Amino acid sequence: MILKKLICLAAVMLFFSFASYAYAGSIGDEPGTPGKWFKGEEPVQKDESKPPLVFVHGINSSSATWFDRNDMAKQAVLNGYESAFIDLYPDQDTKKNGKLLAEKLKEIYDVFGRKLIVIGHSKGGVDTQSALVYHNAHPYVEKVITLGSPHYGTPLADLAYSKGGSWLAEILGQKSDALYSLQTGLMAAFRSETDKLEKFPHKYITYSGSEWGTFGGVLYLGGMYLKSFGANDGAVTVSSTRLSYANNILTGKWDHNSIKNGTSMFPVFQHQLLANAASAEKENIESPNSTELNTDVYVKGGESEKEKTEAFYVEEGTNGLSIQWLNESQEARPEIIAPNGDVLTNLKTSEASFPYEGAFSHHVQINKPVPGKWTIRSNSGKKAPYLLLVSFDSPLNDEIKAEAAKSGDDASTHSSGLIKRLSKKVETFYFKDAQKDHPLKTTASSADQLKKEGAYSVTVHYTGLTASGTSAFNRTVIRTLYVDQDGNIHGDIPY
């Protein structure tokens, strides 16, 4: 009888111990319900001097990212930290996620009874700052650690909303408010407003990665495209992960996935958890906004017929090529025809990564390619979207960049020492929202088109001849710009 009473008493106590945060969910819940959060496993010995850790996931993700093939939650427990894990909207912008996160941070703060340290991966770091600055969550948070967060957006989002890249992204269902908000022009506008309102700049600690794997790896697509923008982790450039006023602690040999791995990262940022944020070492950085053009890629995309043929030019002196053909089919591998008639069919196929999850990348690297007109041919058997990305390792890249920067709005054709002729064509699309675009009149100088408030995807096609007059070349520059309600243009104008 006494044993039964003890069991009943224990059950009642257990019920009430969970009741205070039962609304938050539990580890056994199906992950991915926006607004649900749960406490992590309790450490053997609680230490009230250690702030609770709140883990926030990124775009197209959920709280499961900290558990699935990841021991971050375990590392927190082993090191004596209480923790909480939250699910935000995987496909919503920083405004909506920031509001939701602010509400939940107050709940979590009330449960633990002391200030929190928020650890945000990727867009989760941006959502966290939105919660603090725009939705008054600062009182609940001691500091914020961001892991590979695109504080200035990512050119991969620009690519997904460009004329060439949007077809495939839309068919794959990747175009969302979340991806839309990460375009560099929109994030430039976000930074312009947010940085002025940030009252506690020393709360932020950033970490970044500079690895994106080897040829054919899961982050190879993003890394190859981003390399002309600088060091990157396969999804975000190092410069974008840094804030001018934050404690930008370290850039390490992590990619965008491994930077959230517990074994890799917890020992790295552990000493920052108890450090005074205002007194932490701060790395001096240059402005993340680079006005340089990335002139080492050629981009073409759209919707193909059953058979699709695209052509591009390789100039003399090119050291190497990286060719990627993205489509929905693992089997529909393209063939590449060199100017001398050689046919390449041994392309490697792998699953594509952000922002083209669900697609397949068929790719090949070519050393010392034959100069001239190259052709890539694909037979999908049906109408299907595709995206062609060609990266050039060429001495001409810097020359094109320098000459393109000189061209200004009034010049569409000019020459230099290594270039006989350089021409450009500008295509501009206006976005009313994350799903709909509206083409604007194409002109060589389209700055005067940027009048209406909203986002503008600008694609600049460069074509020309080298000094010999016999070798053609082509490049593509893509940027998203944002015009605010006062007519201010945010982002790098690529012409």
Briefly describe each language-model feature range:
Residues 60-61, 90-91, 150-152, 211-213, ...:
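Short, solvent-exposed loop/turn segments at secondary-structure junctions
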Residues 27-32, 39-114:
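Active-site catalytic motif of lipid deacylating hydrolases and related acyltransferases
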Residues 2-9, 13-62, 79, 292, ...:
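Flexible, membrane-associating and regulatory peripheral segments of lipid-active enzymes
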Residues 25, 53-57, 83, 95-195, ...:
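Serine-dependent carboxylesterase/thioesterase catalytic core
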Residues 360-366, 371-374:
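Ligand-binding face of N-terminal immunoglobulin V-set domains in extracellular IgSF glycoproteins
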Residues 198-333, 377, 382, 403:
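C-terminal catalytic-base region of ester-bond hydrolases, centering on the histidine
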Residues 68, 155-160, 216-221:
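Short aromatic-enriched loop/helix-cap "lid" or pocket-rim segments at secondary-structure transitions
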Residues 65-84, 106-114, 119, 247-251, ...:
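Elongated, non-catalytic scaffold/linker segments and compositionally distinctive motifs
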